[in-house]
Amino acid sequence: TKDVDVEKVRALAPDLVLANQEENARPAIESLIAAGVPVHVSFPRTVPEALAYLGSLATLLGVEEPAIARRAFARHAVIERTPRRVFVPIWRDPWMTFDENAFASDLLALVGAQNVFADRPRRYPLAADLGKRAAMTGARVAGRDTRYPRIQLQEVVERAPDLVLLPDEPYAFGPADRDVLAELLPEAEVRLTDGKDLFWYGARLATSIDALAEAVDRRSRPA
């Protein structure tokens, strides 16, 4: 949960708290640390950073680092592929996606997919993100998160993806959304996919790498 009840956590006297810089509120994490609670904060933006996180977590827990994720990374990193141009929305109303600085973008690149919005940062304010006014610049946007642009469907058409992956989280895309995008992009393959394969960077990373590689592979098109 983003909003941690600090007092309830302290009452549990945990040996270790696993937190994420993006998912958990900073004041709560700082309060736990100030109270002497051991906190391990993660924020991987690339697959190598996720692998490093798994290694550091194994060290903290006093267990052997699982090698399966590193093997999956090494196996796919050496495969030469012609990249597929992929669009992955993460929200609707407004439509949102991610740029090259998000973990999912690096994961997709590993398995042979080029994020068509890699070079499209989020612009402020909302009207600028939607192309209705000039974007704020300089100190006015310093420190703001620009990884998740809000986009219009016309932008998707213009960037011409040949593959669309519709995850079931954080927004639960379904068959109706698939139909909308299939009509919008008649030349593209549109697939529903498990959001955990795109956005979860923990112990399931090896499974995610292989599952995404199969989703991106042209030879694995559903009948």
Predicted regions mapped to residue ranges:
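Binding-cleft/active-site segments that stabilize strongly anionic ligands or cofactors
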Residues: 1-48, 67-206, 222-223
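Helix-loop "lid/cap" segments that line or gate small-molecule binding pockets
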Residues: 54-62
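Short, hydrophobic alpha-helical segments
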Residues: 61, 216-220
